[in-house]
């Protein structure tokens, strides 16, 4: 089965075919660095990181570029509010972005172009659009002339005539004169300098670039005139991505991207996330509660990337449980290896012969279906639960039902596929994760103490021990004859 992706441009799923064999050029719109990243950012960058990981796993060389918008009205507003400079605000929140993404196990991009580092390229692109009749200057500003681009609206499906009808009565000649535009739908490529704001010299006077032109210039500089994948949140379809297409394609005469991909929104308890509603949650606030970063990543992956996802306490609790199941499977040889004679399991990961083909095929089928991560997770759960069952059998019967060689195959397959989804237990955490919980010997000792308490009719003590074990994620199953089985939840 070939990889199929939903292309926002054509509004249908298409078989993915790269421009060049085995090479993929991918551009993702990055953050405007004026505040800490929120759950919407987590959803977006985990989604594209997962897609990138899968493409690499499939053997592609992925050239992944993601920009930073480091000059913008929001950054300037934040600088004024905090009495600092635009550069210091941008630097602070760029560093915060990297900290958050590292915790979420999002791979770094191959390149992070910044708007302020590409002023010359931006000006050259604006000048080219002006020469070709797609842009005009007006009082120090430069605007894109939307009606000159006949395909405007092809991504968003919006028609100028419909937008104009919707705007009727809201734009009059005085507004147009004030805005210095020929048409209310024209948008700024270059903004004339304002007192106290950063500005650069240009053929149109001192000023700074508009938002949309930045990405067009950086895509061309880093990846060329036509790329394979352009991705971002669904909120960027209009006007940002629509305007990018208008700028780039008017300049080059070539399509900007073959595939336009957009991730769905995050809601909080069914409501749109916003500061005004008081339900705005940053990544770091959530992780500092603490929520395991991999549980947050798991939460994002439980929905296919194009679908909306609702953040609730129940959803994050379910994601925590899901991650604990997979983590337990990943830690299986570190916990049970000594009893099985399984030494240095990490060495097995490089042995491709240990990968179970049937699971690989099911995983690939799921991911080829427009990166269907919920279906892919189901395959990981199947492997992890099999390993959990074998661990419980080993504890109670002293041996596993499955051979060591087969257990190795299940484990290597689980770890390999988990890595494709970015779900990993760091090496330095492997021992500590086991030691954080009760050891098997400690559990058996407490069960024996509970049995003795019950024999002495000290039921309050027996209940206390049961509750203590339950708080540690240990479920007890009392059998006839005074036997108690247990397993980790």
Swiss-Prot record:
Cofactor detail note: Binds 1 zinc ion per subunit.
Pfam family, one: tRNA-synt_1e
Keywords: Aminoacyl-tRNA synthetase, ATP-binding, Cytoplasm, Ligase, Metal-binding, Nucleotide-binding, Protein biosynthesis, Zinc
Protein name (Swiss-Prot/TrEMBL): Cysteine--tRNA ligase
GO cellular component labels: cytosol
InterPro entries from the UniProt entry: Cys-tRNA-ligase, Cys-tRNA-synt_Ia_DALR, Cys-tRNA/MSH_ligase, Rossmann-like_a/b/a_fold, tRNA-synt_1_cat_dom, tRNAsynth_Ia_anticodon-bd
Family to which this protein belongs: Belongs to the class-I aminoacyl-tRNA synthetase family.
Residues annotated for ATP binding in this entry: 275
Record GO terms (molecular function): ATP binding; cysteine-tRNA ligase activity; zinc ion binding
Listed NCBIfam families: cysS
Summary of subunit composition and partner proteins: Monomer.
Necessary cofactors: Zn(2+)
The protein's Enzyme Commission number: 6.1.1.16
GO biological process: cysteinyl-tRNA aminoacylation
Sequence motif: 'KMSKS' region, positions: 272-276
Compartments in which it is found: Cytoplasm
Organism ancestry: Bacteria, Bacillati, Cyanobacteriota, Cyanophyceae, Oscillatoriophycideae
Organism per entry: Trichodesmium erythraeum (strain IMS101)
Motif window: 'HIGH' region: 31-41
Binding positions (Zn(2+)): 29, 215, 240, 244
Catalytic activity field: tRNA(Cys) + L-cysteine + ATP = L-cysteinyl-tRNA(Cys) + AMP + diphosphate
């Amino acid at each position: 089965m070939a990889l199929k992706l939903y292309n926002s441009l054509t509004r249908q799923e298409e078989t993915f075919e790269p421009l060049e064999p085995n090479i993929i050029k991918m551009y993702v719109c990055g953050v405007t660095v004026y505040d800490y990243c929120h759950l919407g950012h987590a959803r977006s960058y985990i989604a594209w990181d997962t897609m990138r990981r899968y493409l690499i796993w499939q053997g592609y060389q992925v050239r992944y570029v993601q920009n930073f918008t480091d000059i913008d009205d929001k950054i300037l507003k934040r600088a004024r509010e905090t009495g600092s400079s635009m550069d210091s605000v941008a630097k602070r929140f760029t560093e915060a972005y990297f900290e958050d993404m590292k915790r979420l196990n999002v791979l770094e991009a191959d390149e992070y172009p910044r708007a302020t580092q590409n002023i010359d390229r931006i000006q050259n692109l604006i000048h080219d659009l002006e020469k070709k009749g797609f842009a005009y200057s007006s009082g120090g500003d430069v605007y894109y002339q939307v009606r000159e681009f006949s395909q405007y609206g092809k991504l968003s499906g919006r028609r100028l005539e419909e937008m104009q009808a919707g705007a009727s009565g809201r734009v009059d000649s005085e507004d147009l004169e004030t805005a210095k535009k020929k048409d209310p739908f024209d948008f700024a490529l270059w903004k004339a300098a304002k007192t106290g704001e950063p500005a650069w010299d240009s053929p149109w006077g001192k000023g700074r670039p508009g938002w949309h032109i930045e990405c067009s210039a950086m895509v061309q500089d880093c990846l060329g005139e036509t790329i394979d994948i352009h991705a971002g949140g669904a909120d960027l379809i209009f006007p940002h991505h629509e305007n990018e297409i208008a700028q780039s394609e008017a300049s080059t005469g070539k399509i900007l991207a073959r595939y336009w991909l957009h991730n769905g929104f995050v809601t909080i308890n069914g409501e749109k996330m916003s500061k005004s509603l008081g339900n705005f949650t940053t990544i770091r606030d959530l992780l500092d509660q603490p929520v395991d970063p991999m549980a947050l990543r798991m939460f994002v992956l439980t929905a296919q990337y194009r679908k909306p996802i609702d953040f609730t306490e129940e959803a994050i609790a379910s994601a925590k449980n899901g991650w604990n199941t997979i983590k337990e499977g990943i830690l299986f040889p570190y916990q049970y290896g000594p009893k099985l004679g399984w030494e240095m399991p990490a060495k097995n990961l490089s042995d491709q012969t240990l990968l179970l083909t049937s699971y690989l095929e099911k995983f690939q089928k799921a991911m080829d279906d427009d990166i269907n991560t919920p279906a892919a997770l189901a395959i990981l759960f199947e492997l992890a639960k099999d390993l959990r069952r074998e661990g419980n059998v080993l504890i109670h019967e002293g041996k596993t039902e499955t051979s060591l060689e087969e257990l190795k195959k299940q484990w290597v397959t689980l770890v390999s596929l988990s890595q494709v989804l970015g779900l990993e237990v760091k090496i330095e955490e492997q021992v500590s994760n086991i030691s954080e919980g009760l050891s098997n010997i400690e559990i058996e000792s407490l069960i024996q103490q509970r049995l003795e308490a019950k024999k002495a009719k000290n039921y309050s003590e027996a209940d206390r021990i049961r509750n203590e074990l339950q708080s540690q994620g240990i479920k007890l199953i009392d059998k006839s004859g005074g036997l108690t089985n247990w397993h980790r939840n």
